[in-house]
């Protein structure tokens, strides 16, 4: 693709930023002061003051979520306005946004280990699960926003057992609970076929809502370079041991693994 002039360039407002995500034809990015929505040509189209210590940005086609990791606040916007502001009583560990704009926040709870809560585009709490036994590390929403998957682990005797649980958002009912023995969960992505891609310290698992699991790819943590999730798909960059390549890229979508 050919580019003319600086049409693909975006100049950051303060020269640096903490996190960013693709949004519409440009970029949503944040520093400790604000969230910015910018288009190529260095044009900032929307700006929200946040004042976060550690901002994290997630996006879908129509909305942008920014939350303060380690803090207690989150903001949801569209391309031109703030849709919801959430102020919590507990510190946010991680979060994600679904295709519908509904979003998930995982928090460190007093009296419990962790909690996972789903919020609507209006900031209303739609679902919450908390546990004193399970430490939740990741989660994601289905494309239609009707179900949520959470990844966590528990200590059983001398072992750490990872769990992948699916819940119905409206009723709060647990659909399934799949144990991944001898695997420590790192990241979960809810795929668009209704299953979950689960990255663990020994590789990638595919877990269905019916409770079945498949060890689809063996990857050691020392070989994992990076992982990213977006639009109900996961991408893995793994150290390569073949030819002159430095890394292999794998894409996980619709319940299948593609690559390298």
Where are these regions (language model features)?
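N-terminal "mature head" segments of proteins
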Residues: 1-70
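Repeated scaffold domains used in trafficking and secretory/extracellular systems
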Residues: 12-22, 50-62, 90-99, 133-143, ...
């Amino acid at each position: 693709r050919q580019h003319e002039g600086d049409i693909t360039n975006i100049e950051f407002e303060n020269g640096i930023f903490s996190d960013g995500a693709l949004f519409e034809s440009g970029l949503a990015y944040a520093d400790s002061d604000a969230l910015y929505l910018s288009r190529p040509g260095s044009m900032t189209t929307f700006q929200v003051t946040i004042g976060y210590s550690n901002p994290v940005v997630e996006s879908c086609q129509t909305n942008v979520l920014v939350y303060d990791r380690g803090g207690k606040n989150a903001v949801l916007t569209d391309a031109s306005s703030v849709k919801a502001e959430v102020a919590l009583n507990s510190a946010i560990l991680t979060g994600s946004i679904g295709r519908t704009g509904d979003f998930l926040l995982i928090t460190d709870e007093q009296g419990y280990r962790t909690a996972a809560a789903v919020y609507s585009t209006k900031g209303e709490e739609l679902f919450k699960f908390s546990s004193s036994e399970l430490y939740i590390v990741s989660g994601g929403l289905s494309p239609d926003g009707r179900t949520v998957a959470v990844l966590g682990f528990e200590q059983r005797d001398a072992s750490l057992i990872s769990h992948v649980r699916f819940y119905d958002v409206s009723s709060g009912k647990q659909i399934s609970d799949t144990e991944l023995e001898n695997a420590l969960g790192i990241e979960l992505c809810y795929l668009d076929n209704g299953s979950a891609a689960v990255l663990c310290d020994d590789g990638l698992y595919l877990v269905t809502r019916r409770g079945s699991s498949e060890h689809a790819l063996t990857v050691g943590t020392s070989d994992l370079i990076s992982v990213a999730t977006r639009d109900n798909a996961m991408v893995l960059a793994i150290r390569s041991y073949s030819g002159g390549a430095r890394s292999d890229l794998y894409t996980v979508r619709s319940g299948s693994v593609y690559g390298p």
